Structure formats: C-alpha cells, structure tokens
Amino acid sequence: MGVEKIKAAFENGKKAFIPYVMGGDGGLEKLKERIRFLDEAGASIVEIGIPFSDPVADGPTIQRAGKRALDSGVTVKGIFQALIEVRKEVQIPFVLMTYLNPVLAFGKEQFIENCIEAGVDGIIVPDLPYEEQDIIAPLLRTANIALIPLVTVTSPIERIEKITSESEGFVYAVTVAGVTGVRQNFKEEIHSYLEKVKSHTHLPVVAGFGISTKEHVEEMITICDGVVVGSKVIELLENEKREEICELIQATKQKEEA
C-alpha cells in the first residue's frame, strides 16, 4: 500500500493513465462502479475528488460534478465508506484530490485514519502551499501515504527542486495557467517546461489540466511519465461514452510499447 504502490505504476518504463472521478457525483454506488470500470479498463491510478463548495483550481466541468455531489448530500465519510467497500475488489492505487478545508473540517488525524482504512495511496491538496505542508505531511509520512506535489509553468527551478526533493509518489505538473478543463492545444513552451521538471526531480512526472484527446495524451506521454485526465473523463462518464475512455487508456499503452 501507499508510496510503493504508486511507484509500481511507473516501473519499467510504464506510462500512467490517471483518470479523475468526482466522489459522489451520481451517488456512492456510481463511484464504486466507476472505479471498478476504470480498473478493468486498464487505468494505472484513479484520482478521486472530494467535493468542496469553493473549488478554486477546478474548471466548470469539475465544479459542476462537485456541486452535483454536494447537492445530493454526499459526505466525506460516505466517500470513505464507498472506498473501503470497493477497495476489497480492486488493486488500483487510489489518490485523493482534496482541498485543505475538508481535511481540517473532518479532523486531519481522523481523515488520515480513514485514508488508511480505505487503502488510499496518495493525496493531492491543490491549495496547500509547500511552506505550510507540515500541517499534514508528517502524519501522511507516518501512514506511508504520498503527499503529491503540484508544480506550475511559473514555478522557478529552485522551487521545483525544493518541492520535489521532499515529496513522494509523482510530481503533478500543471500544464496550463488557470483552472482545469478541456483545451484544444498546448503551447510549445509546455514541452520545455515538462522537460525542465523531468530533469530536476527523481520522481515520475505526470502532466495534468486540460488534457482531453488521444493526441494530447500521445503528445504528453512522449515527454513525461503519465497524464491525468479529469474534465474529459467526467464528461465521457456522464454521457456513457466509456469506449472513448478506453481509447485514451490505449493511447497511453501504445506509446509505452513504442
């Protein structure tokens, strides 16, 4: 469990496809069913969002999914219970994407205890600055749960080195300035940015924010170790276009074999 399980997703040159699902969007049974589907479809890791009322890093698709979950009365405790149940059926690593507020409101010790019980392997907290990560980092380290760092296009080299040197799991490289969401293409400087991040960390580098097509996946996979696909996966799940998710996963695997 934990850090080692995430590492294994990248071993021997494997490229990681990491889909994002919003916890409780469509109900908790739907969450479990979607995780089972993504596991069977060959996803490397599944990222599960904890819905929050003020999601500053999320684009409209993920915001709507979070609002649907909150409006239906889904709770953090309920999401943990669903993960505990589905964990008995799947081996895929779980990474939670949560804002800091739900962690503190739940009680950070209790939150991490629930993570252990649910077999959570890593956590991403987009609004937790590196300088304040000691709020939860020591507890996560003790629990063998990776605190996955985010770096951005505007992060200086020294900061990237500092952030990633003390981190575990993988580096989440944000490929656009702004919020998550589907985009048509990426600027050329994204390539040099990803190469820069790769050359300054010992961890696998995963690109995320705005990746939505097979072409995006193939482009990013040539430079880095994996991709997170969020808004597009939510749209495809909502519209029952699951074969297109399988095609995105296949694009990752084909690049791995090439």
Curated annotation (Swiss-Prot):
Please tell me which top-level EC class this enzyme sits in. Answer: lyase
Enzyme Commission code: 4.2.1.20
PROSITE patterns in alphabetical order: TRP_SYNTHASE_ALPHA (PS00167)
Q: Which reaction does it catalyse?
A: (1S,2R)-1-C-(indol-3-yl)glycerol 3-phosphate + L-serine = D-glyceraldehyde 3-phosphate + L-tryptophan + H2O
CDD domains in alphabetical order: Tryptophan_synthase_alpha
Is Amino-acid biosynthesis one of the keywords? yes
Instruction: Tell me which domain of life the UniProt entry assigns to the organism this sequence originates from.
Output: Bacteria
What molecular function terms (GO) are annotated for this protein? tryptophan synthase activity
Q: Which residues form a coiled coil?
A: none
Pathway involvement?
Amino-acid biosynthesis; L-tryptophan biosynthesis; L-tryptophan from chorismate: step 5/5
Q: Which InterPro entries match?
A: Aldolase_TIM, RibuloseP-bd_barrel, Trp_synthase_alpha_AS, Trp_synthase_suA
Keyword Amino-acid biosynthesis tagged: yes
Task: Please explain the role this protein plays, according to its UniProt record.
Answer: The alpha subunit is responsible for the aldol cleavage of indoleglycerol phosphate to indole and glyceraldehyde 3-phosphate.
HAMAP family hit by this protein: Trp_synth_alpha
Report the protein name in the record: Tryptophan synthase alpha chain
Q: Which gene encodes it?
A: trpA
